[in-house]
Amino acid sequence: MSSQVPIVFIMLAVGLGCGKTEVEPAEISATPPAVQPLIESTPPIVQKELFFDQDNLDHRKIETAINVTLRQKKQQGQASLTGMRIIPRRAWPKLKSGDVLQLTELDVGGKDIADISPLTELSQLKSLFLTENRITDLSPLAGHTQLLSLTLDGNGQLQDLSPLVNLKGLRLLYLDRNHVADLSPLAGLTELKYLYLRDNQVDNLEPLGNLKHLVVLDLGGNKITDLIPLMNLSELKHLSVDDSPYLPQDEIEKLQSALPHCKISHDASE
């Protein structure tokens, strides 16, 4: 046993010596390599499954719209850093929310759909087009707090705007040609700049009185009788109140005096 100890010791010493004399230490850069984030300044989104019911025609139309948008972005080279996955058209997969993380704009207009529940988890959207459909339930949009632009004109029987109450970042909202009467859910959307409410059932403008950043407001074709709530909207530049048979001419004149820089469009006969 005693004769083996120095041999082992010598072998270790030689091994260590070889490491010092023949192998140069690797250079370590003081600057870490740059890493391209998927989306800057945005916390990671928890993966959730998005279900498209193959027996639900509305779901299939929404899936197709998402697919079209993904393909367009892929063709434009916008998916190169994110590994965007295209949904197989006939596979009807369980799509993960992370797969469409890059979608900030989606057009599902003119599809004659009523059920928009598949949009619930796409809360990263900034612009959403849902014009010319049959939507009456907006609850799937309640968590879409990143939306800047929402287009809902031409849905006919849409009345309840309460699911929009927390969309505080909205800048543009199209609601023309619906059946909206109650504007109270919009009272807290103080970042709105462009609001289109033509051809609805609106008769009370009080909820709009605090929307100080409104620049364009279209109220034509409603049941309004006074414009007093708009008197303090100092940034308002364009107001349409044409086709408002219950609105007296003197209301228009009073508002014009209060907001001299606002162009008010109205029927000459009023």
Where are these regions (language model features)?
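Short, low-complexity, disordered segments immediately C-terminal to signal peptides
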Residues: 22-41
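Conserved hydrophobic beta-strand positions in leucine-rich repeat
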Residues: 50, 104-108, 128-130, 148-152, ...
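The feature encodes a structural signal of leucine-rich repeats
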Residues: 94-95, 113-120, 135-142, 158-165, ...
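Leucine-rich repeat
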Residues: 100, 119-125, 141-147, 155, ...
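Conserved "Asn-ladder"/turn position within leucine-rich repeats
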Residues: 111, 133, 155-156, 178, ...
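Leucine-rich solenoid repeat scaffolds
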Residues: 222-270
